C-alpha cells in the first residue's frame, strides 16, 4: 500500500489473490495482479470468481479461468468493497468519492443509484456495501461522524427510498470497515483502528489503539450488540 513503510521492501510492489484450504490452512493457489495494480477489496461473483477493486487506479477486475479481466471503463475514482447484485449479473460498487453505482458485468456499463428526493442520505465515504435483497448495508468511514447504515432500495435496485442509522457517534464505534451478512444478521468491524494511524501506517501522536470490536445488527429484533 502506498505510504506504508512498516514492512520489508521485499513485500512491496505487488498484489495477489490467494486461495487457502479452509480445513488444513494450506495455500492452494496464488494469482498475481497485473503489473501496477494495487488490490484493495474483494467479493465473489455468482460462480465464485473473485472480483477485486483497485482504490488507487479506480479499476475493477474479475478473475476467470486464471486470467484477470478488467470490467469497468474508467468510471470510478476510488472503488471499495463491492457487492454482487441480486440478479447475479450486476455489481454494486461504492466509490469513496462519487457514491453508489451499478455495473453490468457483461458490458461494463455503469449507472449511478439515485438518492431519495425526500430523505436523502450522504453516499460519499462508503468503505463497503453488503446486499440483502432490496436492502444495502453500508459502512461509512469517510463522513463525520462515521456510521453504519441500512439503505432501502426500490424494486429495480436503482433508487434509494430511505435509510436507517444502525450505529453512529456511539462510544463503541471507532472507524468501521468491513462487514458480512450471515442469515438475518449483519456483522461488522466497529473499530478497525485506521483512525489511529497516520499516512505511513504508524500510530499518530496522542492516539491510542483499542481492542478490536465486532458488532452484530439483527433486523428481527432490531438492534446492535458487541460480540
Where are these regions (language model features)?
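Short, conserved, GDST-rich strand-edge loop motifs in beta-rich repeat architectures
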Residues: 1-13, 81, 191-211
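Beta-rich, blade/repeat-based domains predominating
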Residues: 1-3, 33-50, 75-98, 118-139, ...
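Short loop/turn segments immediately following the C-termini of beta-strands
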Residues: 2-5, 55-57, 95-96, 141-143, ...
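Structural signal for beta-propeller blades
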Residues: 7-8, 17, 58-61, 99-101, ...
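Asp-box/WD-like beta-propeller blade repeats and closely related beta-sheet repeat scaffolds
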Residues: 9-49, 53
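Beta-propeller blade signature
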Residues: 12-23, 150-154, 202-222
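Short loop/turn segments that connect beta-strands within beta-propeller blades
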Residues: 21-26, 63-67, 104-109, 152-157, ...
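A short beta-strand motif characteristic of beta-propeller blades
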Residues: 26-32, 67-73, 109-121, 161-169
Amino acid at each position: 500500500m502506498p505510504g506504508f513503510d512498516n514492512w520489508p521492501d521485499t513485500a512491496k510492489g505487488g498484489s495477489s489473490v490467494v486461495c487457502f484450504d479452509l480445513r488444513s490452512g494450506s495455500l492452494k493457489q496464488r494469482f498475481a495482479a497485473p503489473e501496477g495494480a494495487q488490490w484493495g477489496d474483494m467479493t465473489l461473483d455468482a460462480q465464485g470468481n473473485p472480483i477485486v477493486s483497485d482504490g488507487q487506479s479506480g479499476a475493477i477486475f474479475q478473475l476467470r479461468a486464471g486470467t484477470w479481466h478488467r470490467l469497468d471503463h474508467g468510471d470510478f475514482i476510488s472503488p471499495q468493497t463491492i457487492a454482487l447484485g441480486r440478479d447475479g449479473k450486476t455489481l454494486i460498487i461504492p466509490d469513496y468519492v462519487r457514491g453508489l453505482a451499478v455495473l453490468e458485468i457483461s458490458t461494463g456499463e455503469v449507472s449511478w443509484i439515485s438518492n431519495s428526493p425526500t430523505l436523502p442520505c450522504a453516499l460519499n465515504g462508503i468503505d463497503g456495501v453488503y446486499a440483502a435483497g432490496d436492502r444495502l448495508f453500508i459502512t461509512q468511514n469517510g463522513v463525520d461522524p462515521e456510521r453504519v447504515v441500512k439503505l432501502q432500495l426500490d424494486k429495480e435496485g436503482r433508487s434509494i427510498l430511505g435509510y436507517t442509522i444502525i450505529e453512529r457517534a456511539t462510544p463503541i464505534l471507532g472507524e468501521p470497515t468491513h462487514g458480512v451478512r450471515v442469515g438475518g444478521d449483519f456483522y461488522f468491524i466497529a473499530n478497525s483502528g485506521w483512525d489511529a494511524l497516520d499516512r505511513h501506517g504508524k500510530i499518530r501522536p496522542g492516539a491510542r489503539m483499542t481492542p478490536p470490536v465486532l458488532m452484530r445488527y439483527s433486523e428481527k429484533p432490531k438492534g446492535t450488540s458487541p460480540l
